[in-house]
Amino acid sequence: MIPTYMNIMLAFTISLLGMLTYRSHLVASLLCLEGMMMSLFIMTTLIASNTHSPLINIMPIILLVFAACEAAVGLALLISISNTYGLDYIHNLNLLQC
């Protein structure tokens, strides 16, 4: 396997392990999720540049749009929770309450 692909898969795996390990803090979870999205973006960009297919060239752009939307929603949620409760611990929050 090419070392570039191995490094990108390693970055995705480390971000996934960070997401599973630091799931009690919202900031850490959002950063790990962003790392996963960026490694997926780089991987799809490399695959799209190697295949030279016009249909797959739009995939990295779509993934980047989803990553930007995820970051915006996550940041808005973080600001809302920290303004309301004053902390970012996920296990202390029960967002299903009316």
Swiss-Prot record:
Native source species: Macaca nigra (Celebes black macaque)
Family the UniProt entry places it in: Belongs to the complex I subunit 4L family.
The protein's name: NADH-ubiquinone oxidoreductase chain 4L
Lineage, broadest ranks: Eukaryota, Metazoa, Chordata, Craniata, Vertebrata
InterPro entries, per the entry: NADH_UbQ_OxRdtase_chain4L/K, NUOK/Mnh_C1-like
Principal place of residence: mitochondrion
Stretches that traverse the bilayer: 1-21, 27-47, 61-81
Membrane topology, as annotated: Multi-pass membrane protein
Subunit structure: Core subunit of respiratory chain NADH dehydrogenase (Complex I) which is composed of 45 different subunits.
